């Protein structure tokens, strides 16, 4: 005998209902599953029905049999469940004995109930005539009058015109509520307050009711402010017996749809409760009610109760009544319909009691941060809560389920029960936190905020509590960290790395090992447990910047600054070293280099590259490294009036940025100007002084000052330094960007400065491009420099700084540096491996380039310029590019070359090579050539004023009256940034932001926006090991990712699926902590045309996108239409709810991308406004 026949036999033997035991549920989603469970306990056979769009819905799988409603395309997704005749035909064909309507759809439709009975099938619910007398809210008011139960003032019957609504408003005043006479769930309801558009509200309510319930009839009643919504669960048999199962508090609502329900009501006085329960039973008896239903009341601030309606059906929240009474309401419904009396079921009023409390939360796929906009998509992860006192009633809640825009957004109902309200509240919080739902937005963050609100804790909420409490929307959203990381790893597995500048894969196939340091006795130093030795930062923190500088000057020797964490990897590895690898070695560095003057670790190109290419937050890097290295000062590179940007910014932006840098961990600010323009330099210097940082005002060294006739000679430098000293600086910086300072020049310059300024600390920076930097820095030290820059051996030489070990060897026996040579060697082992890990960013430089004395390309730029030349197809013309760089420099007037001026020279050089132009050609054709923007900016004066002025007539020829000629500091021409407005805009666009976000946006608006998009998609990528950030994972390779202290993800790539030729996607399979996860990724190598509509750019205010997926009911504008801010442009229907899409600004419609009846996805582009018609504040 088959297992199905055995099961059927069991049902026949144990059926409580005899031969009539086949039940069909005319509904979808969660409620059929709930009904099937009770039916199965009664040994019944169950039948599900489903629309074509619901063919993968879970409810059809939970039934013994399931049948589709009609044929594909015959009905709309909602219309299928409203197809009465079709549903009854299915029931008759399959010999159904009972039909249960669930809630919503046809559950309150008397015509359907009548048709079911006439078809010879038992209807589980009140008879049609009772539905007519109570299900219609207007009829319910007549019932209340017969039962002498108070009601809220309202129209005596249904209304058909707007004028009738206006007449009521004129008689009773505002506010009023327009309500659908049929149905519920908050649909077909509109509150109208004074000044609102009554006609529009009436039209929307009737249209929504017609769509949801097939009947657009509405009525109007007085709207009570801040009432409680109390409902009483009723059961009535076919013999006139009625009992109540006590009350539920359903006051926590949004859009008149319940969000959280509590049973019993926590704060309802006993006498009010008793009166409501009595009235509920009285109403049921007067109307001859049968089966399950709910009498609903409002309770005002004076504890007066008003009857609203009887819902002639099972309610979504029946679960919590079951939990506090122990009564299976659905089972009772079925048995009453089969003829059982309440007495036979043991349901006597004096025997029915409550125990404890129960709370139900409806978990939906809605985004609370976007006004509860329904979200659609695929559930990538679904892991539910459980444990003592937790009940789940779900529908299509499983990994892989598709959330459609056609139906209600509820995923699962979570009901928690316990002995006290407070115990249950805490249990619910725990349960919600346990849920893991990924792939769509949910309302869980909102529910958690709601449950912890003091009003909810006290139980004193009211029906508009959510609307009246904006702080409920200050939510802490689920971070979804693991799933976002999987999306990145999946994309990497399918499409490879998209990091700009990466060529090939890392040579190192494992993670670098962290070396051990040893003390003088040979014992291993535990760098994670023992605090690092005190360093120069302790001096700074205790004594302040001035005394710090004084003690640096008094140090008997030459201190070293390690540039490995910034300029070294900028020069050798395209600035691509990640926070992950810096943080890994940071504790060891704090011990090994405890005597160092500073670590250069921030600012300059590292700032924008972190966001632009590494997808990291530079501020998070700074804070993380600061926490790991508390003893060594941090130094950053500040581009004077540019901050860390490439052009001048308003002074208040520089002040704001520097303050954030100081507050988050920067100690010493090397401030420079690319042209040694002292007016530009002063902006940065003053900002550092205001912030309380150490000022290292810096003069940029250019060329070989020993050559006769050079523009930048000793007198020039002495003159610039004198003005810097007058300006006020704690330390003097000398920045030799290209490494052209020869040892003899170093001796002369530093010696001259030391003689003239005996008390001023001098800090020298150079590059080893020519291979002479060790000798030059030795000469500086011997000539009296207080600090020189070096890099760890494996990250030194070529375009980087000189080797720390080579310099230590050169100074050994003559000058103390305070550095332990053995510790440096041990530290170097890590960076030797690290260099291999980042080999895919190495420039193809084989050795020193003494030609630097001719072309003067800065070390940090030389490798980038080589890469750019290769990208532009000029790699084979590298020698020509270097010659062009020298010519370009002289065309521009032989300027100081450091970011951003070095970029100007580089851009002009590449322009010349790619267009085969000589310097003579440039001079001759300047008035007809289209130069790179950076060259135009330079000649305009936006970068500053060069020493000796601009070359004429070239400047005039290049500008050609297209641009002005600035003669003052560019910042003086700029309006201060409105920091408060920027902060507000960023908050609205990106949610939780801080002052560091404002500073980042001020420096690089577009880069910051792109970074935020990446972070929203992939999360914090800085936690990934670099090998797995740059290279696809190997199958079955185990990746450990620590996302916070004590939380480590273990990820394994299982497989990459075949290409889906229709979608162009591949499925990538992972194990995450042993659990299978599947991610879909577009294969970018496939040229598959997408049929998707264009998406609106959320950062472009003249593009209007769909707020959610749904169907366009009405397009209200056309091309050329003039619209006002807030004016409706379209009406969208989704999840049985209508939403008006409004214009964000005044303007004229440029394009319309939709038509009536068209389906759209969330963010699909609907309308574009003419950009020039927008107010200046809203232009992109």
Swiss-Prot record:
First-listed, main subcellular location of the protein, grouped into a coarse class: cytoplasm
N-acetylserine sites (modified residues): 2
* Record domain ATP-grasp: where: 141-338
Q: Does the keyword Ion transport apply?
A: no
Q: Looking at the Swiss-Prot or TrEMBL record, what is one Pfam family this protein matches?
A: CPSase_L_D2
Which biological process terms from the Gene Ontology are attached to this UniProt entry?
Answer: gluconeogenesis; pyruvate metabolic process
- For the modification N6-carboxylysine, the affected residues are 735
Q: Which parts of the sequence bind substrate?
A: 566-570, 639, 899
Gene Ontology MF terms in the entry: ATP binding; metal ion binding; pyruvate carboxylase activity
Location of the protein in the cell: Cytoplasm
GO cellular component assignments: cytosol
In the UniProt entry, which residues are flagged as the active site?
Answer: 313
Q: In which pathway does it act?
A: Carbohydrate biosynthesis; gluconeogenesis
Needed cofactors: biotin; Zn(2+)
Highest taxon of the source?
A: Eukaryota
User: Which signals induce this protein?
Assistant: By glucose.
**Quaternary data:** Homotetramer.
Q: Which PANTHER family match?
A: PYRUVATE CARBOXYLASE (PTHR43778), PYRUVATE CARBOXYLASE, MITOCHONDRIAL (PTHR43778:SF2)
| Physiological role | Pyruvate carboxylase catalyzes a 2-step reaction, involving the ATP-dependent carboxylation of the covalently attached biotin in the first step and the transfer of the carboxyl group to pyruvate in the second.
Name the UniProt record assigns to this protein? Pyruvate carboxylase 2
Organism, scientific name: Saccharomyces cerevisiae (strain ATCC 204508 / S288c)
Tell me the name of the encoding gene: PYC2
């Amino acid at each position: 005998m088959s297992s199905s026949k055995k099961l059927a036999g069991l049902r026949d033997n144990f059926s409580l209902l005899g031969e009539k035991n086949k039940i069909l549920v005319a509904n979808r989603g969660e409620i059929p599953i709930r009904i099937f469970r009770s039916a199965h306990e009664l040994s019944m056979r169950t039948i599900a029905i489903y629309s074509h769009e619901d063919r993968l819905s879970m409810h059809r799988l939970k039934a013994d049999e399931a049948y589709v409603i009609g044929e594909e395309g015959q009905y709309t997704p909602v219309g299928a469940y409203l197809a009465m005749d079709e549903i009854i035909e299915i029931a008759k064909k399959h010999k159904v004995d009972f039909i249960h309507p669930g809630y919503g759809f046809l559950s309150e439709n008397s015509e359907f109930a009548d048709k079911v009975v006439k078809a010879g099938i038992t209807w589980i619910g009140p008879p049609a005539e009772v539905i007519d007398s109570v299900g219609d809210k207007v009829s319910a008011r007549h019932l209340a009058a017969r039962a002498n139960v108070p009601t809220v003032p309202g129209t005596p019957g249904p209304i058909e015109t707007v004028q009738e609504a206006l007449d009521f408003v004129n008689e009773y005043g505002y506010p009023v509520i327009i309500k659908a006479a049929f149905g519920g769930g908050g649909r077909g309801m509109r509150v109208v307050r004074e000044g609102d558009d009554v006609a529009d509200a009436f039209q929307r309510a009737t249209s929504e009711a017609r769509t949801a319930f097939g009947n657009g009839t509405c009525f109007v009643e007085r709207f009570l402010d801040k009432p409680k919504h109390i409902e009483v669960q009723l059961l009535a048999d076919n013999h006139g017996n009625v009992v109540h199962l006590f009350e539920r508090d359903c006051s926590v609502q949004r859009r008149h749809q319940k969000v959280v329900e509590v049973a019993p009501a926590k704060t309802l006085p006993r006498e009010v409760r008793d009166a409501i329960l009595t009235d509920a039973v009285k109403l049921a008896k007067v109307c001859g009610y049968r089966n399950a239903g709910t009498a609903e009341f409002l309770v005002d601030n004076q504890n007066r109760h008003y009857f609203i309606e009887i819902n002639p059906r099972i309610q979504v929240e029946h679960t919590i009544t079951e939990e506090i009474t122990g009564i299976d309401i659905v089972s009772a419904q079925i048995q009453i319909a089969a003829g059982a009396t309440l007495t036979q079921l043991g349901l006597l009023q004096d025997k029915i009691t409550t125990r404890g409390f129960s709370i139900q939360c409806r978990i939906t796929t809605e985004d609370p941060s976007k006004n509860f906009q329904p979200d659609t998509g695929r559930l990538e992860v679904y892991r539910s809560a459980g444990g003592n006192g937790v009940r789940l009633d779900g529908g299509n809640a499983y990994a892989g389920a598709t959330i459609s825009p056609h139906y209600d957004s509820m995923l699962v109902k979570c009901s928690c029960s316990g002995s006290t309200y407070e115990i249950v509240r805490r249990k619910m919080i725990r349960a919600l936190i346990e849920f893991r739902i990924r792939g769509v937005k949910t309302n869980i963050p909102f529910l958690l905020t709601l449950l912890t609100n003091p009003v909810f804790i006290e139980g004193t909420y009211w029906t508009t509590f959510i609307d009246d409490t904006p702080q409920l929307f200050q939510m802490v959203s689920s971070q979804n960290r693991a799933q976002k990381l999987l999306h990145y790893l999946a994309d990497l597995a399918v499409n490879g790395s998209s990091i700009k500048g990466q060529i090939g894969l890392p040579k190192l196939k494992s993670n670098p090992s962290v070396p051990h340091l040893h003390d003088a006795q040979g014992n291993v130093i535990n760098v994670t447990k023992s605090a690092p030795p005190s360093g120069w930062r302790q001096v700074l923190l205790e004594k302040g910047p001035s005394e710090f500088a004084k003690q640096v000057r008094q140090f008997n020797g030459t201190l070293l600054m390690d540039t490995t964490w910034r300029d070294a990897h900028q020069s050798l590895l395209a600035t691509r070293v990640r926070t992950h690898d810096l943080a890994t070695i940071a504790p060891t560095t704090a011990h090994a280099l405890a005597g160092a003057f500073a670590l250069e670790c921030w600012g300059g190109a590292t700032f924008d590259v972190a966001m632009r290419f590494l997808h990291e937050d530079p501020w998070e890097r700074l804070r993380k490294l600061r926490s790991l290295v508390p003893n060594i000062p941090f130094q950053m590179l500040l581009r004077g009036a540019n901050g860390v940007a490439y052009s001048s910014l308003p002074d208040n932006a520089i002040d704001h940025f520097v303050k954030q840098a100081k507050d988050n961990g920067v100690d010493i600010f090397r401030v420079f100007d690319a042209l040694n323009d002292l007016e530009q330099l002063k902006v940065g210097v003053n900002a550092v002084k205001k912030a309380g940082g150490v000022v290292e005002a810096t003069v940029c060294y250019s060329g070989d000052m020993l050559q006769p006739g050079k523009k930048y000679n000793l007198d020039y430098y002495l003159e610039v330094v004198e003005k810097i000293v007058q300006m006020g600086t704690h330390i003097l910086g000398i920045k030799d960007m290209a490494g052209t300072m020869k040892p003899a020049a170093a001796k002369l310059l530093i010696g001259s400065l030391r003689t003239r300024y005996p008390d001023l600390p001098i800090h020298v920076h150079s590059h080893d491009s020519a291979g002479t930097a060790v000798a030059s820095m030795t000469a500086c030290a011997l000539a009296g420099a207080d600090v020189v820059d070096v890099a760890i051996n494996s990250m030194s030489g070529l375009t980087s700084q000189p080797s720390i070990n080579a310099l230590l060897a050169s100074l050994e026996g003559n000058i103390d540096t305070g550095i332990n040579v053995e510790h440096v060697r041990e530290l170097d082992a890590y960076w030797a491996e690290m260099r291999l890990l980042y080999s895919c960013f190495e420039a193809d430089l084989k050795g020193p380039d003494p030609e630097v004395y001719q072309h003067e390309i800065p070390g940090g730029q030389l490798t980038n310029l080589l890469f750019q030349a290769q990208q532009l197809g000029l790699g084979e013309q590298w020698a020509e590019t270097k010659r062009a760089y020298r010519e370009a420099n002289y065309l521009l007037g032989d300027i100081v070359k450091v970011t951003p001026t070095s970029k100007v020279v580089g851009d002009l050089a590449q322009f010349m090579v790619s267009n085969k132009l000589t310097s003579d050609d440039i001079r001759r054709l300047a008035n007809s050539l289209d130069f790179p923007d950076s060259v135009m900016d330079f000649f305009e004066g936006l970068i500053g004023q060069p020493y000796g002025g601009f070359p004429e007539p070239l400047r005039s020829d290049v500008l050609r009256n297209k641009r002005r000629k600035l003669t003052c500091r560019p910042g003086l021409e700029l309006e201060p940034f409105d920091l408060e407005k920027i902060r507000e805009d960023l908050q609205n666009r990106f949610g939780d932001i801080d002052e560091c976000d404002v500073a980042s946006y001020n420096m690089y608006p577009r880069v910051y926006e792109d970074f935020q998009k990446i972070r929203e998609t992939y999360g914090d990528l800085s936690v990934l090991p670099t090998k797995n950030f740059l290279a696809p994972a190997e199958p079955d390779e185990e990746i450990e990712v620590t996302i916070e202290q004590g939380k480590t993800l273990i990820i394994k790539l299982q497989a990459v699926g075949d290409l889906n030729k229709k979608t162009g996607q591949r499925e990538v399979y992972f194990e995450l902590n042993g659990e299978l996860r599947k991610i879909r990724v577009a294969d970018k190598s496939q040229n598959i045309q997408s049929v998707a509509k264009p998406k609106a750019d959320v950062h472009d205010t003249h593009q209007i996108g769909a707020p959610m997926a749904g169907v366009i009911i009405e397009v209200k504008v056309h091309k050329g239409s003039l619209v006002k801010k807030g004016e409706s442009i379209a009406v969208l229907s989704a999840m049985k709810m209508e939403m008006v899409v409004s214009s964000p600004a005044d303007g004229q419609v440029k394009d319309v991308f939709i038509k009536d009846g068209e389906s759209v996805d969330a963010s699909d582009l609907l309308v574009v406004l003419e950009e020039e018609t927008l107010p200046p504040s809203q232009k992109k």
